[in-house]
Design a protein with these regions (language model features):
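Extracytoplasmic/periplasmic substrate-binding proteins
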Residues: 105-123, 127-128
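Active-site-proximal catalytic alpha-helix in oxidoreductases
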Residues: 96-97, 126-137, 153-157
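Sec/Tat-exported extracytoplasmic proteins
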Residues: 7, 31, 45, 50, ...
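A bilobed periplasmic-binding-protein/Venus flytrap-type ligand-binding module shared by bacterial periplasmic
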Residues: 25-35, 129-146
Length: 219
């Protein structure tokens, strides 16, 4: 979504590869808020990532007819940082999470999956493409640069497909190169296992149908 928005603003970027076939974006809600379906969002506070992730959320709420300016009939949008604190501290009823990362941070913080309700954008029909590889359009006029990008995309997709087939080994490579020591084997292996579900089915080509779905979701 942010790439489309940038293009609309006049930034001449083009997609040269789309490793991710499916969306990992979801809303994770506390069950004790009484939320059982999207219609229960009214009157609730929802943490939303910006930097492009707000576009599918706002489109989703528009489709549901739910205002995003607060009030008992709408939702209050909390501009969420890239953490899960608003849910853990009960500042928000729902927060944005990725299937492969922040959701598991909530679980690792001691919250049982049974105490959560999850709404995957993919299941709600409002999924948009994520994590493509982009370049400035003018650069592609350079034959040498174009050749470099062809080889780069081929190598990248070869790596993604290897990681799909060998998630634990891929996670171990990340751990071996973690200079901070902050990453854990459990989290990295779990992340790669979930990411493999999102890259599955992609050969790196931008599927026109997926592109059109993204555009229609945002309109």
């Amino acid at each position: 979504p942010s790439a489309l928005a940038a293009r609309e603003r006049g930034v001449p970027i083009v997609n040269i590869a789309q490793p991710f076939k499916s969306s990992g974006l979801q809303l994770t809600c506390r069950k004790d808020t009484g939320i059982k379906s999207p219609s229960d969002f009214r009157g609730k506070t929802i943490g939303v990532w910006f930097f492009g992730n707000e576009y599918p959320f706002l489109s989703w709420m528009s489709q549901l007819g739910i205002p995003t300016n607060g009030g008992s009939d709408g939702v209050t949008v909390l501009k969420q940082g890239f953490n899960v604190d608003p849910l853990l501290q009960k500042q928000a009823d729902c927060i944005s999470t990725m299937t492969y990362n922040e959701y598991w941070q909530v679980i690792d913080a001691g919250v049982s999956p049974d105490d959560l309700v999850v709404f995957k954008y993919q299941d709600q029909g409002v999924a948009t493409l994520e994590d493509g590889i982009y370049v400035l359009e003018d650069r592609l006029k350079d034959a040498d640069f174009q050749d470099q990008m062809v080889r780069f995309v081929r190598a990248s997709m070869k790596g993604w497909k290897w990681a799909e087939a060998n998630p634990d080994a891929a996670a171990d490579i990340v751990l071996d190169n973690d200079a901070t020591g902050a990453q854990t084997e459990k989290h990295q292996r779990r992340m790669m296992g979930e990411i493999a579900k999102l890259t599955a089915g992609s050969n790196g080509t931008l599927d026109p149908a997926d592109y059109e779905r993204t555009v229609s979701t945002l309109l």
